[in-house]
Design a protein with these regions (language model features):
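Glycine-aromatic micro-motifs
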Residues: 1-161
Length: 161
């Protein structure tokens, strides 16, 4: 088993099941906090035709997400989903706090070739990320912050078009 911190579409157990072919809700430990990073849409996914989430170092910020305790058999399918083999994302091992406990050597994924500016998410990706955040019980204030960030990026994109 390995610990995995999800902060984007993988927060949604339903969407994760779509690619891992297994119900993952049973592996949810709870919502967790990753300190020293912030969220950003610094990758364009051709498959999703959307800006997709990344975490970038930022000493003054934190990211809330979902901590999973997954069986090893899901490691390779998760890497495939995150495009590791083609250089989309890479593993990063981090420390997160969940239910008052510190978890070390937790796998998360970070974008390899980051865009210089954030790219807005599609409506579909927007909804999957929010559904995961709400389903897994992330704090309401964080869900609203996530909603507002994604919505502002979409508004900026519409104005630029």
């Amino acid at each position: 088993m390995f610990y995995y911190f999800a902060y984007g579409s993988c927060m949604c157990p339903v969407d994760l099941k779509r690619t891992l072919k297994e119900n993952t809700h049973q592996y949810v430990v709870g919502h967790a906090i990753l300190s020293g990073y912030r969220l950003g849409f610094y990758r364009y996914s051709k498959m999703r035709r959307s800006g997709v989430l990344d975490v970038v170092p930022d000493d003054k910020s934190s990211v809330t997400g979902v901590l999973y305790h997954l069986p090893w058999r899901l490691s390779q399918p998760l890497d495939i989903r995150e495009d590791v083999h083609r250089g989309g994302y890479r593993h990063e091992y981090v420390e997160v706090k969940c239910h008052g406990k510190i978890y070390r050597n937790v796998r998360t994924y970070v974008v390899v070739d980051k865009l210089k500016q954030e790219m807005a998410p599609s409506d579909w990706y927007f909804n999957v990320v929010l559904r995961g955040a709400v389903t897994c019980g992330l704090p309401e204030e964080y869900c609203w912050s996530l909603f507002n960030h994604m919505h502002q990026l979409q508004l900026q994109q519409q104005k630029a078009a």
